[in-house]
Amino acid sequence: MKKSQQSALRRLAVTTLVTIASAVTAVTTQAAYIVNATEVGGDVVFEGSGSIDTAAWSFNADRNRSAFVQPNESFTVGASLAADYYSGAFSGPATIGPGTAFTTADSRTGDYTGINWNFPALFLPSGYVSGQPIAGTATYAAATFATLGITPGSYQWTWGSGATADSLTLNVGAVPIPAAAWLFGSGLLGLVGVARRKARA
């Protein structure tokens, strides 16, 4: 392969990788709150992080709550007992499993955050500022998805439109890989293939 061809291939590779990386970054930095629930060492652990835009919601009241899950109604994470309750409207699933029991987490950390799809309502840390990064966990000792009454899968609630559009996602079990990540992997494989073909030429 001539040096000019090698240089052109390198430029193509760099340009492609930068484009793909930008797409991945755009996906991961979009305002949203994501909770991943996993079975770990005989426990079930909910881990949430992100931010929430409250522009499409109305502050309702202060509440004192502890992290819990009730599959047919709501779930929350976080250690703070003091929380702000927001009312509004959103689209999303009406259940995350067949269970109906209210189960309080055995241990919890971080910012109190959650959703109730029956009211509907959002629970956020007391004094929460819209768009502020938050994170929280809830651990259910000696539990499984089945004993908590939740079904593995991905659940998403969305609200607002345009600049105020936002979402809360709960992934129960395996965490899905974003489409941009698949694009990134496909791009890398494609570049490897091109390089090999050029090398043989």
Which stretches of residues belong to each language-model region?
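Short, threonine-centered small-residue motifs that mark membrane-proximal processing/anchoring sites
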Residues: 7-34, 161-189, 200
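Mature extracellular "passenger" or substrate-interacting domains of secreted, surface-exposed proteins
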Residues: 32-174
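Structural signal for the C-terminal ends of transmembrane alpha-helices
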Residues: 194-197
